[in-house]
């Protein structure tokens, strides 16, 4: 492929199209829901929800849209759950004209989205920033959240942690330039922060293409989301939750250090368990996808939260009425 052809062809847009195709092929459809007051949330929802199945919401973090963060994991859950994959506000096709930027508001909008699609109860998986939203959802609407998975979500951070040197950055402004990369150099820096073994030798034109497609919309609004996460944050103000909770953390997370995972476990208490994945960083869902999926399935798949798949013999008995 010539350099001119490469410039005209977007690998990122093509990958995004592939994810759209795979989500649709898995039985989901793209749906934009008007929540009122200038707020629209996009979500991948089941084409035909089955009342016999439990529900599962997969909430993404910063970075590309929700499809990119859960695309490799969707196949593990689609047969057992009614799966919903929303784009949080200012990501993908979701937006609001309202001024609120808190994870509490994101959670309220997610709850309205659930109600709009007739979902009364659900289990929730939240990655990084999505974990902040998932935690708030569980705290505000405890009757709606059955089980909770929080992956590398620094919910228990405090504003003073920045000054105390817990993070690898010294200011929110520095964090924003990394989490919202606008140059190939900053995207490479984000990759070094997110992965234990980041890809090497990625050409700048490829990184620029990714930034143009995935990182150029709602940049200022996303900066405000980051600012709001840390402002005046104190652990003493974080509400308790009682739902069964799985905490997953990359052992070498450089964005939200492992100390925050242990802090979260102590805060939630006996209803929480923590799994630490070795040789993984912040993007543990992408860096260790098999191990990540294994722990999700072990926690979410049980006789109470999902129907068991009938065996081949049971299918034969049902088809030919052999039980009589």
Q: Predicted regions span which residues?
A:
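Alpha/beta-hydrolase fold catalytic core
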Residues: 1-56, 79-81, 301-324
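Short beta-strand/loop motif that positions the catalytic acidic residue
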Residues: 241, 247-249, 253
């Amino acid at each position: 492929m010539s350099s001119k052809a490469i410039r005209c062809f977007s690998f990122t847009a093509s990958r995004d199209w592939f994810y759209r195709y795979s989500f649709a092929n898995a039985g989901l459809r793209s749906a934009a829901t008007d929540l009122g007051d200038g707020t629209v949330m996009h979500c991948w929802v089941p084409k035909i929800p089955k009342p016999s199945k439990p529900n599962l919401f997969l909430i993404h973090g910063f970075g590309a849209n929700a499809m990119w963060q859960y695309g490799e994991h969707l196949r593990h859950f689609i047969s057992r759950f009614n799966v919903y994959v929303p784009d949080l506000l200012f990501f993908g096709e979701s937006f609001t004209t309202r001024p609120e930027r808190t994870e509490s508001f994101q959670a309220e909008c997610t709850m309205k989205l659930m109600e709009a699609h007739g979902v009364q109860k659900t289990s929730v998986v939240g990655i990084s920033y999505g974990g902040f939203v998932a935690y708030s959802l569980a705290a505000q609407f405890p009757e709606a959240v059955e089980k909770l998975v929080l992956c590398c979500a620094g919910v228990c951070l405090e504003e003073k942690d920045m000054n105390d040197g817990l993070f690898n950055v010294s200011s929110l402004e520095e964090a924003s330039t990394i989490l919202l990369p606008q140059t190939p150099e900053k995207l490479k820096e984000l990759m070094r922060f997110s992965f234990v073994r980041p890809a090497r030798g990625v050409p700048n034109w490829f990184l620029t293409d990714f930034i143009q497609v995935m990182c150029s919309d709602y940049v200022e609004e996303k900066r405000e989301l980051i600012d709001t996460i840390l402002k005046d944050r104190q652990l003493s103000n974080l509400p308790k939750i009682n739902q069964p909770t799985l905490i997953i953390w990359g052992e070498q997370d450089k964005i939200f250090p492992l100390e925050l995972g242990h802090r979260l476990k102590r805060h939630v208490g006996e209803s929480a368990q923590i799994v630490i994945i070795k040789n993984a960083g912040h993007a543990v869902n992408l860096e260790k996808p098999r191990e990540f999926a294994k722990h999700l399935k072990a926690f979410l798949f049980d006789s109470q939260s999902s129907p068991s798949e009938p065996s081949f013999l049971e299918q034969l008995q049902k088809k030919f009425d052999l039980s009589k």
